Design a protein with these regions (language model features):
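Conserved catalytic cysteine-centered active-site region
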Residues: 1-13
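Terminal-appendage/accessory-domain detector
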Residues: 14-17, 21-31, 38-168
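A broadly conserved amphipathic alpha-helix scaffold signal in soluble, globular proteins
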Residues: 2, 35-38
C-alpha cells in the first residue's frame, strides 16, 4: 500500500519512515507527467475540476481554502525546471549545508578531523526531525545513513569526501 501511495505522489512519508521507496518518488512523478502528456495527446480527458471540484485537490488537501489564483498565477509563465539541480552528495538535501560547511572548514584546516571531538549542528525543526536524530541503522541502514547529519558529517570528516559507496 505504501508503494501505491508513493506512486500517486501524495506523500513524502517515505522520507520520514526511512524506506528506500523514497528513491523512486521523483522518477514516478516525472513518469506520470510523460504518461499524462501522451494521454492528452491521444485525447484522453482528465477531470477539468481536479483542483476545484467537490473531491478535488483543494477540497482534499486544503479544506477548500487554498488561494488558487495565487498558486496558479505563474502557470505557463514560470517553469521550475530552471530551478532544479543535481545534488552534490548522495544524501538527503537537508544534510548538504552541513556537508558544505564541513568541507569548507576542512579546506581551511586539513587536520580538522584529528581535532574534533563533537559537532553541534543547529537547524530548523523540520530539518532536525528529518536528518538530525542520532544515527540508528534500523531496517534499512543505507536510507538511515542518507538521512543522518551525524552519519554524513562523520564520514565527511573521516574520509574528506562523501560518495555513494559510503552508504553500502
Amino acid at each position: 500500500m505504501g508503494l501505491a501511495a508513493e506512486q500517486a505522489g501524495l506523500s513524502r512519508q517515505p522520507l520520514a519512515d526511512r524506506v528506500n521507496g523514497k528513491n523512486i518518488l521523483c522518477g514516478l512523478a516525472a513518469g506520470q507527467a510523460i504518461h499524462s502528456a501522451f494521454a492528452a495527446q491521444a485525447e484522453i480527458k482528465g477531470s477539468p475540476n481536479f483542483l476545484t471540484g467537490r473531491f478535488g485537490l483543494n477540497a482534499i488537501f486544503a479544506g477548500g481554502n487554498a488561494d488558487l489564483e495565487k498558486g496558479l498565477a505563474d502557470l505557463g509563465k514560470k517553469f521550475s525546471v530552471t530551478e532544479t539541480s543535481i545534488k552534490l552528495y548522495p544524501s538527503c538535501r537537508s544534510t548538504h549545508p552541513g556537508l558544505d560547511l564541513t568541507f569548507d572548514m576542512m579546506a581551511d584546516e586539513p587536520d580538522l578531523a584529528n581535532r574534533v571531538d563533537t559537532i553541534e549542528v543547529t537547524s530548523s525543526k523540520i530539518v532536525n526531525e528529518l536528518v538530525g536524530s542520532p544515527f540508528k541503522p534500523g531496517k534499512d541502514p543505507r536510507v538511515a545513513a542518507q538521512f543522518s547529519i551525524p552519519y554524513t558529517l562523520s564520514v565527511a570528516l573521516k574520509r574528506g569526501k562523501i560518495a555513494l559507496s559510503d552508504f553500502d
